[in-house]
From Swiss-Prot:
<protein>
    <recommendedName>
        <fullName>Protein gns</fullName>
    </recommendedName>
</protein>
<comment type="similarity">
    <text>Belongs to the gns family.</text>
</comment>
<dbReference type="Pfam" id="PF08178">
    <property type="entry name" value="GnsAB_toxin"/>
</dbReference>
<dbReference type="InterPro" id="IPR012563">
    <property type="entry name" value="Gns"/>
</dbReference>
Amino acid sequence: MNSEELTHKAEEEIAALISKKVAELRKKTGQEVSEIEFAPRETMKGLEGYHVKIKLL
C-alpha cells in the first residue's frame, strides 16, 4: 500500500469511529451533537495528537 492508500484508509477508520461515538452519545444523553472541535496537540517533536471538544444541543 502506498501512502495515499494508507491515508485514505486511516481517514475512513477515523470517520467511522467518530460516527460510532456520536451515535453512542445520542443514545446515552438523548441529545444531538452540534459540534466537534479538534485542536492540535503539538510538542517540540511535532504533532502529538488532538484535543477533542464535543458540544451537545
